[in-house]
Amino acid sequence: MMTNGTGRAGTVRRGAGALAAVLATTLLAGCGPAGTDSGSGGTASTSPSANPKQALLAAVPDGSEGAFRFSGKDATSDLSGVVDPAAKGIDLTAAVKDPEHGFTTRMSFLVVQERIWMKVKFTGTDGLTGLPKLPNRWMELDRSRLTDPDATPTYEGVDVGNAGPIIQAATTVEEKADRTYAGVVDLTAAEAAKAVGEEEVAALGDAARQVPFTAVVGADGNLTSLTLDVPAAGTAKAWTYVVKYADYGSAPKLAAPGGDAAQPAPKLAYQMLNG
């Protein structure tokens, strides 16, 4: 039991389980734009295209660009990591601060093919006792030992930020001369709602049909950022959905950790994930 005098039992377990679910679902829904190629990483144009929407979709990563970095945030979380299409791998990290006790849980997952490893680190723990003591190495997980195997990440494609389905749901797209795009997205479209979060979209009501966005394409023709400015709705404050892609072809390649860098996950790791 973790406590600082007023603590609640199970805080870390609940937090770790929720964080794992966030890492597996937020910005990693594995959606694909309906009825269109999600992109080919083509050469950027210096003048507006005849079809800005299709030009923007063509900039969405499709796996031909090599390994690249990504980061993103939505209403509740921030993620960052690397995607390596050749390895069918992702390396992603998120950090969540406990609002009651003040410590931060930093959780990382590494997926290569069908295998998955996890790391957990706690910071800001002065004065706290009972935090789980886990190895500093990558801990390989057996999905069959998880209560919900789908709550941990899997490799489901390169567009981890779901830029494709969001852009596909755009009702207007305007291309600027500096490779910046602006427009409006109808988030009630099925795949777009899944990408951003169906509960969050439902809370917007009619405003979900008119959500402004901006996007930037790099000189190499690849998407570098997509930002949705989600309006306030009811008691919910306005928030932004941001996806950033960078270092196409130059990010580190992913591989299964070997030797002393990894070990089988201990029982305590499964207790954290299973809640």
Regions found by a protein language model. Give the residues of each.
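Subset-of-secretome marker
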Residues: 3, 32-275
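Bacterial N-terminal signal peptides that target proteins for export
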Residues: 2-19
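C-terminal motif of bacterial Sec signal peptides marking the signal peptidase cleavage site
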Residues: 26-30
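Short hydrophobic/aromatic segments of transmembrane alpha-helices and their interfaces
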Residues: 19-20, 206
